[in-house]
Each structure stands twice: as structure tokens, then as C-alpha cells.
Amino acid sequence: MRISLLAGSAVTVLILAGCSSTSDEEPARVFATPDGPGLSAAVTEDALVGHLQELEAIAAAHDGNRAAGTAGYDASVDYVVSQLESAGFEVTTPEFEFETFEAQTQTLSLAGTEIPVFALSYSPTTPAEGITARVVGAPAGADGCETADYAGLDLAGAVAVVPRGVCPFGAKQTVAAELGAAATIIVNNEPGPLDSGTLGDPETAKIPTGGVSQEDGAAVLAAPEVTLTLVTTTDTTTSRNIIAQTTTGSTENVVVAGAHLDSVPEGPGINDNGTGTSAVLETALQMGSAPEVTNAVRFAFWGAEEDGLVGSTKYVEGLSDDDKRNIALYLNFDMIGSHNAGYLAYDGDDSDKVGEPAGPAGSDAIERTFVERLAADGVAADGTDFDGRSDYGPFIEVGIPAGGVFSGADENKTAEQAAKWGGTADQTFDENYHTDQDTLANVDRAALAKNGAAVAYGIGVYAQSVEGPNGVPVGAAREAARAEG
């Protein structure tokens, strides 16, 4: 059994069931005071790094990754479950199915020249020799979201070329397919490749669809004919979430704290998202399964986040109306130790006026909790948009307030941010994002420690109260707020 000793702070001692009075008995497990200050002091950098070392070793033993549906992910589940059970939690690992997509061949040729193209997830496959057809571009100013955008044009058997934006990729290829197009090429609407994107699901996908850069889009449109080859496969895979809840605290104001456990297939996923996993896990271990808290805390470790937030979406979809009503808030932790780290709190009040609107009522208060905690640690946090790229998405969708901290992914750090946080301006927060270099060696340990303490603090604060200046709607106010949403 693992023993945690917290010097200089109040602790709660739980003698685990089954201990005897003999000299062979297991020693008492020591838990932290289950509030913001107590938990933030107890969640140490060394403990977080210890979990990351275990996850990295798991990846190394399983083809270098911990992706959903693989043995590496299953071993990661086993590790987290064993840790939680050692702290007395009753743990469930509900299974779910999801579709996995892989592109074996991705080529686009015009006049003998190869142009980089990337298959959008769930794109149907072309014949092995590809599709050779004339090019028909959406008229200038048209976005390809409606059949009227192609008025007067003959798409039958053609490769439709449309700009990114306005409507989902799936809608663009559906419109082109309805007009008889053989394939679709979507051109990025900003510099750089269009190397990720999805058609939604296999049922939505109608015709082979790839993405090209803004720079290459002009050449494609100017070509009379192109050959597109996308050899792809879509398979049904099973994965699991991990759920563990305290036996104490109100079940009418549940605090859900989550992190996705899976990596991408390309690497071990130690920052993304071993760091978030380690912080949520260590907070659970320090809190224990029966802490003296006002509100129950539900710890969640999501599967298949990298495949489209699948685990968290399946979980929320499976909740009854009462289940959703009884969740006071959701705290999300996805990447907290980026190599060129930022200190970001989800912009619950939309004060930054960037991207998506404010989160559900109470999200502004959650943002304040984390901003204030980081400020107490000498860090002036910035906001980060609820852009739908992590597991808060399904919770926000049903009106549950959300928040958390984040150290940045593929966005660039600004000069102003580098001046106040250190690091390198005009470079991405994590150049190792979704690569085989997402390793412990490339985790910013100072950011891991500060953000890890903030994770524990936020969970502890709301475990004790979801009301007050930084509280969220409760009772009738919650009903009203979610009805309006």
C-alpha cells in the first residue's frame, strides 16, 4: 500500500477495513484535509511525476502509445483503477463503442505534381487507383453549404472544391454528393494545412473528402483535372471510462472532476493528457473515498477523447434528467504541463470575446476560482476559449457549468504571455503536441506543479461548497438557469 505523509498540515486518518491489531497490519493511510488549501498542499510535484513515469512506462511497453482501443490504454485503465481502489474507492469502468478511422493512402495529383492532402475522418475510401475527374469549384463568395451555391454548375462525376468555414465539413460533402460529385476537396481558410477534421460519423460520410492548405487550394482550383486517392478504413472499437465517487457529501450537488486518459496513436501522451490524469488521480488519492465534504465528488477518466470526445459524450448521453440536474459543475483538466507552458483558465464569462460564447451560468465563477488560485501562486492567468476541443463540451451542451486550467496546445504564445510567464514568444505552447515527443522529458515541471495544485484547490473548494461568491446555481436557481439555456 502506498503511504502519503503530509507534513505541517491538518490530516484525516482512515484505518482501512480488514486491518488487524497484529504487527503485520497495514499502516493507517493518511488523507489530506479535503478542502482547497489542504488538497493543494498535498498534491505535490513528485507525486504527479510518479504517475507520469508509470504512464510513460505503460506506453513504452505497448507500442509507444496509450490510444483508446489498444493494450496501452487498457493498461492505463488498470493502473488508475488500482490506485483508486487502494484509496478505498469503489470503481466502475463502463464500456462504450466508437468508430476508429485510419487513412493508409492520401495523395492528390494534378498535372504530374503531388500536393499534400489529408483525409477527413470517416471519409469513404476511393478505388485503389484513385478518382480522376474534372474540378468544379464553388463560386467566389459561396461556401458550399447549400445546393444553391452551385447553381448553374454541373457537379456530376466531378471533384468539388469548396472553402472551409460557415458549416461543418460533413455538410459540405453532403451537398456535393447530392449534386453528383465523386469527391470533395476542402480548402483551408487560413494559412497552413487542413490536416485534421471530421465528416461527423460514418453515416454522414457520403463521398471521399480530403483537405488541402490555403496555399495549395488555388492550384487545385486552376487544374482542369485531378486524381485523388484516399484509401481509408473505419472500424468499431470498444473502450472504457473510469468513474469513482466519494461515499460522502450531497448527491444533489455533485462535483465532477475529469481528465481524458487516452493518448493519440502517435505517442505516449504524457502532457496530453497524462498531466491532467495525474492531477485528478492524485487529488482523489489525497482526498480518499470518504472525506468530510459537503458535496460528493465524482472523479472521471475519459476514454477516446482523441477520437472525438467519445467517452465523455457517451457518459453525458447516458445520464437521466435527474442525474444531470444533480451535477453542480464539471471541472476539466486537459494538458497542464506544456513544454512552453501557458497559464490559462477557461473563459467562463466570455470576457475575452474570442470564439464561443460564455459557458452555462456559474462558469464565470469557476473561472474566478482558478484565476484567484493561480494569482495566489504568483501567476496572472489568461482566459482560454470554450472551443469544444475537450471533454467539457458535452457537459456545457446540457447546461452544466464548467471550468478548469490548461497550459496550451498548438496555439502560439504571445510576446505579452512570454513576458509574464517565461518561455518563448511566437512558438506553440507545446511543440510536442500529438507527437512521439510528448514525453515526461518535455513536460514543464514548474507548470505541472502550479497547475496541479490549482486542480486540487478547485476540486477541494467545490467539495466544501458550491455556493458563495464563486458558487454556481443551486436548487430552483439551477433549474431556471438550465431551462433558459
Predicted stretch roles:
Residues S121-C145, D201-I270, E282-L285, S289, ...:
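Soluble metallo-hydrolase cores and metallopeptidase-like ectodomains found primarily
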